């Protein structure tokens, strides 16, 4: 899982779902219930559009974040970059859940595999530096 600036609460909720999925998988196994965690990438929906709109409402010239507003906008728009069509996502998800032994973890959609792989492979300091640069946090304010 890749944690990014300006999405702390969102990333925390994804981490919570990850932990809950792991616990439920173990707890429900004796009952024959299988738990599959889905980690979607960019999916064509109104989520990113709404996030961009909300971000604009919070960024004002009086905000301490004003100097790095473009980084905030970039994060809010991140899911708009080559999103997977929702019909393709739904088709692939349905196919996965219909397996006799569905995967424990399913990553679907643009960026769903590459971004977590980067987070896993890159040294933490290098990843932090890249994210700070990408979102305009590499200079003192």
Annotated model-derived regions:
Residues 103, 108-109, 122-141:
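Functional cleft and adjacent loop/helix regions within the main domain
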Residues 5, 40-41, 86, 123:
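Proline-centered helix-kink/hinge sites
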Residues 35, 74-120:
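Core catalytic loop region at the nicotinamide-binding pocket of NAD(P)H-dependent oxidoreductases
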Residues 26, 30-80:
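C-terminal beta-strand-loop-alpha-helix "lid" module of Rossmann-like NAD(P)-dependent dehydrogenases
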Residues 67-84, 88, 130-141:
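A hydrophobic C-terminal alpha-helical subdomain
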Residues 13-16:
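Active-site helix of classical SDR
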């Amino acid at each position: 899982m890749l944690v990014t600036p300006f999405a702390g609460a969102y990333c925390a909720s994804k981490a919570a779902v990850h932990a809950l999925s792991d616990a439920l998988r173990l707890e429900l196994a004796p009952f024959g219930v299988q738990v599959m965690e889905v980690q979607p990438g960019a999916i064509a929906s109104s989520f990113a559009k709404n996030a961009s709109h909300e971000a604009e409402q919070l960024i004002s010239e009086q905000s301490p974040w004003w100097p790095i507003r473009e980084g905030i906008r970039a994060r809010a728009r991140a899911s708009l970059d080559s999103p997977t069509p929702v019909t393709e996502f739904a088709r692939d998800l349905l196919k996965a859940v219909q397996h006799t032994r569905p995967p424990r973890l399913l990553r679907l959609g643009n960026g769903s595999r590459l971004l977590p792989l980067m987070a896993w492979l890159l040294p933490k300091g290098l990843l932090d530096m890249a994210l700070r640069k990408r979102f305009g946090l590499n200079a003192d304010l």
